[in-house]
């Protein structure tokens, strides 16, 4: 049997982390077993479905590199197929017209709730022989079995059973003629030969209804796996109030797709105590036997830790391709400084996101108009003039400009002045970067470049002289 899974989001909002994890699990299961993975857009909610949401889903899938073998399919383009199946069910008696008014159904619901009963349709039209005009408004309901039970073996949770007496006759076609979500899903899974349905646990209650419809159609019943929800740090379902965002927001915040994938796969699945997984390892190792039934808590610090790991362990040239977006957002022209791959190596250890790298790299490419006030107050003082003049002379004398020769020049200056390296290094760092923090000074000075560093030291000396004059005045 060829394994075939699907990811079937509704385009009513962005692709959130819960949906992305479901997509990842479905994709990994298919790839692990050499099967196929398809993308289906379940856009039957015409009022809430939007093109921007469809675009966000596609962008998120592409950014995460979750490629699909078929699709994307759109349910709104299959309405003729759904209605043809419904008409066939009506002719076979597995579905029926229901003419009950909204008012009657609301009265029925209120009475059932007043008696402490679960609200459900009472089947009034199920076996009715009343005559109705062809144009009388009605819905179509599925004739659900009234006895027995539905049992399915969830790949994560084990056997789950529902009594058919608990299931009412589901509406499968609305009064406006449009098919309903639960019905469209069944026809799609049948037509598209889906063998494994992997989705969130909020769909468990839909499963027995869908299985009964499949059986009524004479269709094979797929296997099901219902993934537990993701919680916020307060133990409640992850939502916008926890800062939950769409997948593409993680890109915009400077995360690598490898980091988010690694984080999402571990958000419910494990392989021993291993934390770092390449995509190839995920495909090789993934199985539902190792997926937890319990809800998982989203931990941003863990995601940041993984992102820092991937920034520093993936090839710098590759990381640089993802850094471009953030550099452009900062408006930095990188033609007059180190290559972006070199920048990744320079700042990667100090930064947890690509956005942080872009925000802290400007001094490598552009001259700054002001020094950081605290750093200048502490290190650009008259006592630093001698060190800055001496180190400038030694740097200017270098015929070979490498981190090693830069380091030797700084060390030579400190030895000549009989002071510690910090007495030379800190004023020099503030002079050439404008701040009190940077990567190792020798590689920083080297990356900024000889002529630019020499000019910035002069600027720092002028700054000290100006401040000294102001103080004296």
Curated annotation (Swiss-Prot):
Q: Which CDD domains match?
A: GluRS_core (cd00808)
Write out the residues that bind ATP.
Answer: 240
| Organism whose genome encodes this protein | Sodalis glossinidius (strain morsitans)
Query: What Gene Ontology molecular-function terms does this entry list?
Result: ATP binding; glutamate-tRNA ligase activity; tRNA binding; zinc ion binding
Nucleotide-binding keyword on record? yes
Report one GO cellular component. Answer: cytosol
Q: What does this protein do?
A: Catalyzes the attachment of glutamate to tRNA(Glu) in a two-step reaction: glutamate is first activated by ATP to form Glu-AMP and then transferred to the acceptor end of tRNA(Glu).
- Fetch the InterPro entries from UniProt: aa-tRNA-synth_I_cd-bd, aa-tRNA-synth_I_codon-bd_sub2, aa-tRNA-synth_I_CS, aa_tRNA-synth_I_cd-bd_sf, Glu-tRNA-ligase_bac/mito, Glu/Gln-tRNA-synth, Glu/Gln-tRNA-synth_Ib_cat-dom, GluQ/Sye
Q: Which reaction does it catalyse?
A: tRNA(Glu) + L-glutamate + ATP = L-glutamyl-tRNA(Glu) + AMP + diphosphate
Question: Would the keyword Phosphoprotein turn up in this protein's UniProt record?
Answer: no
Q: Which cofactor does it need?
A: Zn(2+)
Q: Which Gene3D superfamilies match?
A: 1.10.10.350, HUPs
- Per UniProt, the short sequence motif 'HIGH' region occupies residue numbers 9-19
Q: Which residues bind Zn(2+)?
A: 98, 100, 125, 127
Which UniProt keywords are present, listed alphabetically? Aminoacyl-tRNA synthetase, ATP-binding, Cytoplasm, Ligase, Metal-binding, Nucleotide-binding, Protein biosynthesis, Zinc
Sequence motif 'KMSKS' region, residues = 237-241
What does the record's cofactor remark say about binding?
A: Binds 1 zinc ion per subunit.
Q: What is this protein called?
A: Glutamate--tRNA ligase
Gene name per UniProt: gltX
Can you say where in the cell this protein is located?
A: Cytoplasm
| UniProt subunit comment | Monomer.
Q: Give the E.C. number(s).
A: 6.1.1.17
Main location (coarse class) = cytoplasm
Q: Which GO terms describe its biological process?
A: glutamyl-tRNA aminoacylation
Family to which this protein belongs: Belongs to the class-I aminoacyl-tRNA synthetase family. Glutamate--tRNA ligase type 1 subfamily.
Broadest EC class assigned to this enzyme: ligase
């Amino acid at each position: 049997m060829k394994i075939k899974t699907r990811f079937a989001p509704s385009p009513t909002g962005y692709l959130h982390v819960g949906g992305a994890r479901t997509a990842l699990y479905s994709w990994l299961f298919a790839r692990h077993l050499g099967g196929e993975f398809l993308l289906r857009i379940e856009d039957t909610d015409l009022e809430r479905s939007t093109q921007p949401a469809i675009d966000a889903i596609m962008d998120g899938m592409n950014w995460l590199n979750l490629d699909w073998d078929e699709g994307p399919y759109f349910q709104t383009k299959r309405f003729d197929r759904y209605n043809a199946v419904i008409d066939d069910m009506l002719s076979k008696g597995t579905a029926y017209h229901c003419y009950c008014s909204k008012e009657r159904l609301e009265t029925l619901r209120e009475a059932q709730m007043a008696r402490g009963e679960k609200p459900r349709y009472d089947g009034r039209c199920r076996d009715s022989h009343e005559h109705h005009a062809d144009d009388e408004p009605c819905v179509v309901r599925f004739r659900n079995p009234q006895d027995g039970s539905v049992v399915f073996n969830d790949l994560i949770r084990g056997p789950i059973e529902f009594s058919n007496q608990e299931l009412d006759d589901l509406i499968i076609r609305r009064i406006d003629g449009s098919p309903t979500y639960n019905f469209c899903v069944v026809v799609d899974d049948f037509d598209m030969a889906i063998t494994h349905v992997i989705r969130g646990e909020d769909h468990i209650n839909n499963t027995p209804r869908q299985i009964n419809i499949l059986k009524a159609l004479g269709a094979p019943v797929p296997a099901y796996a219902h993934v537990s929800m993701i919680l916020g740090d307060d133990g409640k379902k992850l939502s916008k109030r926890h800062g939950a965002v769409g997948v593409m927001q993680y890109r915009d915040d400077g995360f690598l797709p490898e980091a988010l994938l690694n984080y999402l796969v571990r958000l419910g699945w494990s392989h021993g105590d291993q934390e770092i997984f390449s995509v190839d390892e995920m495909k090789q190792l993934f199985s539902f036997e190792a997926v937890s039934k319990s809800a998982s808590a989203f931990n941003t610090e863990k995601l940041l830790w993984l992102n820092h790991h991937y920034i520093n362990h993936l090839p710098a040239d590759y990381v640089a391709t993802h850094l471009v977006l953030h550099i452009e957002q900062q408006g930095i022209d990188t033609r007059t400084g180190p290559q972006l791959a070199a920048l990744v190596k320079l700042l990667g250890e100090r930064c947890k996101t690509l956005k942080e790298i872009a925000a802290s790299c400007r001094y490598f490419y552009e001259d700054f108009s002001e020094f950081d006030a605290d750093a200048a107050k502490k290190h650009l003082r008259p006592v630093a003039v001698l060190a800055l003049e001496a180190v400038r002379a030694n740097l200017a004398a270098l015929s070979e400009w490498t981190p090693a020769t830069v380091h030797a020049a700084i060390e030579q200056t400190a030895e000549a002045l009989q002071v510690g390296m910090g007495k030379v290094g800190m004023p020099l760092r503030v002079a050439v970067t404008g701040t009190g923090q940077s990567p190792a000074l020798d590689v920083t000075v080297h990356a900024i470049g000889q002529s630019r560093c020499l000019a910035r030291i002069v600027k720092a000396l002028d700054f000290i002289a100006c401040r000294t004059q102001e103080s004296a005045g």
